[in-house]
Amino acid sequence: ASLNYWAGQLKTGAVTQAQLIDLFMEQADFKDRYGPLVRLYTAYFRRIPDYDGLMHWYKNMYPDRGGKGLSLSEVSALFSQSEEFVLTYGELNNLAFVELVYKNVLGAEPAGRADWLNRLALGLSRGEMMIGFSESPENLNSSRIPNSITMAFAGMLRRAPQNVEHAAWLVELK
């Protein structure tokens, strides 16, 4: 629907401001595009994605002029080779990578370490492994509120929340 339509809905009281925000946040083209990218960012770097970085990767995944953008798997592979990742964690062997993923994404000890090491040895990429964790039911559940805050700031304010803002909203929404 157009901007005029939603403005009319607000003006007539058909929806409240809060309801409109909820409607926008639940739109598939917003939630299904930004959500996986925000979760992936958080899984790799354990921080709120900066707005410019988030938009850079979003635009690479969903180019304005059509055409084929990067897949989430390709972005994940690039994250695993990024300067920030290497400077933060160093060069990691597969065991260290598996342990890092469990810690960063699930905050848990690597209970399935042997299985993931075997999958990596058989050719699973680190990027695909990270997506498996960032899109896991456990992470989807535990990251829902924090990532919703980040996505709301990006979608409505065109910026990332500052850490103090993010923390305040976490307290408010939990």
What positions do the PLM features span?
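Composition-driven recognition of low-complexity segments enriched
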Residues: 1-174
